[in-house]
Each structure stands twice: as structure tokens, then as C-alpha cells.
Swiss-Prot record:
NCBIfam families: hemL, PRK00062.1. This is Glutamate-1-semialdehyde 2,1-aminomutase. GO terms for cellular component: cytoplasm. InterPro entries: 4pyrrol_synth_GluAld_NH2Trfase, Aminotrans_3, Aminotrans_3_PPA_site, PyrdxlP-dep_Trfase, PyrdxlP-dep_Trfase_major, PyrdxlP-dep_Trfase_small. The lineage of its organism: Bacteria, Pseudomonadati, Chlorobiota, Chlorobiia, Chlorobiales. Keywords: Chlorophyll biosynthesis, Cytoplasm, Isomerase, Porphyrin biosynthesis, Pyridoxal phosphate.
Amino acid sequence: MPVLTRSAELFEKAKKFIPGGVNSPVRAFKSVGGTPIYMAKGQGAYMTDVDGNTYLDYVGSWGPFILGSMHPRLTAAIEYTLRNIGTSFGTPIEIEIEIAELLCQIVPSLEMVRMVNSGTEATMSAVRLARGYTGKDKIIKFEGCYHGHGDSFLIKAGSGVLTLGDPDSPGVTKGTANDTLNATYNDIESVKAIVNENKGQVAAIIIEPVAGNTGVIPAKKEFLVALRELCDAEGIVLIFDEVMCGFRVALGGAQELYGVTPDLTTMGKIIGGGLPVGAFGGKRKIMENIAPLGSVYQAGTLSGNPLALTAGLETLKILMEENPYPELERKAAFLEAGFKDNMNKLGLNYTQNRVGSMACLFFTENEVYDYNSAITADTAKYGKYFHSMLDQGIYLAPSQFEAMFTSFVHTDEDLEKTVKANYNALVAATK
């Protein structure tokens, strides 16, 4: 068990000045218990905390570190920009054009793209654009899909409160809730029913084609195809939120993997290389409605800043040159098979979901294909599992309902260590 003396001291101090002691809720370890760990350094597939403990990292800054931490080419590019170009100008810069052109080459749906500072900004902007383009107010999202902390997304407007709207967070107005409708993931009939009940009022359907904040739940291809057909028939803008799965499950994202092209796509995480960035883009006829070309307003002081775009551009170049995806698939499949073998030895039958290098071990024997099936997982057992893995030097997400990310720099030795630790942690979780 790692000694966390300094982490505990820092957390107590942080709680005096930062709400809950953290700047993002999941970091507080509330769902697994224990002391949040303060990191001091990252290198490759490893992190070292302020008490000197080292961990094999499967969080990867919640997705961006597909190439690991402190990739030498990436750090060199950022250092060059910092020393020779600058951090921000508030003017157009050439690298904006370079990364926009490259993104449009890589991602099937992109004809034009706008850079922002986070995934939340990207999804908020995409929904505003869809509303402005269509002249309609309502959007459909899916239970269990996370699109950032914009008001429109913090809604549970399905089931018995479908017509009234029920905000999930105080501070979200009833008016906003009324315009956000929740459908069931992987259930096209639930979507059709909502569209029919709100005929001519739905501006957009937004979906994570691989849901990554309810564990990992892949969309069924036939479901995405049916969404595409429904949106075409009803004049609805289809938005793929690929902030998490974009550039990870395939270079061109889930839309390349599934062969289904949305009208708009939101991106983030990997295209920032660990720095704050987001982007949204899609069909030219829609994107041309953004100011200054059109009347839909979107802006940002630091949007397109040189440091973030340098990190993103260099990351994309490395991914294109080195094509890590076959190796990522091999590594993630090795872990999946190893975990399954461990469960077989222990007489367990928990569910594993995986798409490429995104995976989740659910502590349930039920198939997990939507929000309701995901929440059958035993979170108490996951908490025991998490702490056992942590004690063995493996850092996983401190929540049952987050993804495990394999990176290009995880070695075979790292993977074998992880499989061995998994066996011990399964034993600890099921005592």
C-alpha cells in the first residue's frame, strides 16, 4: 500500500481554497473512497506522486495521452513554440490553417472546422450552430452520454419527466430542460418516438458513438445507420461527439470505424496533446453560419493559441506517420484476454466492453449496452478493485463509470504486470 502522507496534507489544504479540493469532481475519489493522489511527474506510461510512489497509468489524463506522457517529439515542438513564437496573440496565425487543413483530411465529416479551448466549448458551440442553422430549439441526447458541463447536457428529460424537463444540476433552468430530450442509447425506437412527439422541433441529435463516461459502451453500427437515416428524413443535424473516441478508436475516429458520417463532429483531448483544446466542424453549408460569415456567434480569447495547436498538430503528425492503431489493438486485446482468463480461473463472469484502446471492466454479469444496464454494476466491488490495483502500482480511473485507456507506450512487460495485478484485485474485490 503506497504511503500518501503528502497527498493527504495537500488535499486538506486544497479543501480550504478549492471547492471539494479539486477542479473536476471525479478527482476527489468520492466514488471509490480514500485520499486523492497528487501527481508530481509523468513520463511515458508512468506517473509519480508527491510521496514518491510510481504508478502505471491507464487514465492518460482522461484520454489525451495516446502517445504517453512527455513524448519527446511533442515536448520538443511545444518548447520550440514557447521559446520562438509565443503563447498567444489574439490574431490569426498560420498554424491554425495547417491544423484545420489536416483535420479536414483526416476526419470524414469535416469540410470546415473551428478551434476552441475545450470539449465542452465544442459541444456547446455545435448545438448552438445546429439550432441556428435549422431554426429549431430542441435537441436529443442519450442517457449516459457525457457532452461536457454545458446547461443543455445536464438534463435528464426522459421517462416520466419527458414533457416537463428535469435538470440534473441546480442552476439549469426549466426552460433549458424543456429543450433537451433524453433517448435510450442503442434504441432507435426510443429516438423515433421522441422525434414524432416533437415533430418539426428537433434541431439536433448529439451522441457519443462510443460512450466513454458510463464505462465504455459502443454504439451498434445499425443504430448509428438508423440515426443517420432518421436525421436525413426529418431535417435534423446529426452530431457525433468524438471528444474522447476521436483519433483513438481509429485515426478518423468512430465515424471512420463505423462508416457513418455525421453532419457535425466535436473533438478534443488527443488533438491537444495534453493541452486545453477543442474543435468542432462538419459540412460547409452548416459551418458557414458561424460568425463572421453567418449570424451564429462563437468566439474565444485563446482559441487557436500557438501552444495548444502545436501540441495537437505534432500529435496528429505522429499518429499519421507511426500508425499506432494495430499495436494499440494488440495491446488492448491482450489485456482483455488476460482479464477474461483471470475471471475464468476465479469463476467470475463480469462484463468487459472494449473498442480499440478504450475499455471498461463492469462489475456486473449483465450485458452492458446502455445507461440502465451499466448502472447494474457493483460500484462497491469496483472500489475494492480500484484500491487493490492502486496498491499494486496500477492507476485506474477512480470511478466504475470511466474508461481505461491503453497507450502506445505501454510495454508488454507493463501489460503482463497489469494482468497479474488484475487477478489479485479481482480476488480482493470479491472477498
